[in-house]
């Protein structure tokens, strides 16, 4: 495990916010590497694994937005089902020439293999170190995720992170996916703190933006050196790994 500490860059507000009293993490893309399925995808679909994993993720997020903006949430589906639907779409789009059909047993087998892999995504290497440090400093922690509780619990247990997370918060409780305000409000109600006193951490720029709009202090973990969303609201800070969370919670002397 690398011990190199990245320096977080302050962004945006000129008035320093109050020190946060708790931290919430996004799960998929932040704690868990959603592209770690690419190796298996490449084995199943030679030459298309990386493209498949990217399209799968993009379509997954697109589907969350589609069902959230439907009238009164009439078309809401749990995240696991949207993830499966997105994978099915991605395979059909990229592997059309492979002569698969939805009823084909081999097609279904490959979907199941990739879905099983998604249950236990790889965690980023610094995660345990950071979560242990937060626990040692007495900082309450939680996950606020589009994933359902069963998905999140299994992912945490399989990665060994479960003992270091105090709260598992799923948008399934309100049936509105991020960036809907009702999704972010779950963090406040669970922690019993206003958003301004909570740090929200995400590696997804759109998620960091939505959390900032809601009033959270935010850390955007920009692992791949991407530009931030061009909508006029920067995160509180930008970092390059989860270790930058610890800069918000210095050790007391």
Question: What is the predicted role of each segment?
Answer:
Residues 2-20, 132, 144, 148-253:
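Asp-based, Mg2+/Mn2+-dependent phosphohydrolase catalytic module
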Residues 11-61:
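Active-site neighborhood of HAD-like aspartate-dependent phosphohydrolases
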Residues 45-49, 93-106, 136, 160-164, ...:
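Short helix-capping segments at alpha-helix termini
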Residues 50, 63-113:
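A metal-dependent, Asp-based hydrolase signature
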Residues 80-81, 100-143, 153, 181:
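Short, acidic loop-to-helix structural element flanking the phosphoryl-transfer center
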């Amino acid at each position: 495990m690398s011990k190199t500490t990245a320096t977080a860059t302050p962004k945006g507000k000129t008035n320093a916010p109050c020190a946060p009293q708790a931290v919430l993490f996004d799960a998929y893309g932040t704690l868990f590497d959603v592209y770690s399925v690419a190796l298996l995808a490449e084995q199943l679909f030679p030459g298309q694994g990386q493209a498949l994993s990217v399209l799968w993720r993009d379509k997954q997020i697109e589907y969350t937005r589609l069902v959230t903006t439907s009238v009164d949430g009439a078309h809401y589906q749990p995240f696991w089902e949207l993830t499966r639907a997105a994978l099915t779409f991605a395979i059909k789009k990229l592997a059309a020439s492979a002569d698969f059909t939805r009823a084909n047993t081999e097609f279904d087998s490959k979907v199941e293999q990739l879905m099983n892999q998604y249950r236990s995504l790889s965690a980023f290497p610094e995660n345990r170190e950071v979560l242990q440090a937060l626990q040692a400093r007495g900082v309450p922690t939680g996950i606020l995720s589009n994933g359902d509780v069963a998905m999140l619990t299994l992912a945490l247990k399989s990665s060994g992170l479960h003992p270091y997370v105090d709260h598992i918060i799923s948008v399934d409780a309100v049936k509105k996916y991020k960036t809907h305000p009702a999704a972010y409000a779950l963090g406040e109600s669970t922690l019993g703190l206003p958003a301004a006193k909570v740090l929200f951490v995400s590696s997804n720029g759109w998620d960091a933006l939505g959390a900032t709009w809601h009033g959270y202090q935010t850390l955007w973990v920009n692992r791949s050196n991407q530009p931030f969303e061009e909508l006029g609201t920067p995160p509180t800070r930008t970092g390059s790994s989860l270790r930058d969370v610890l800069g918000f919670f210095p050790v007391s002397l």
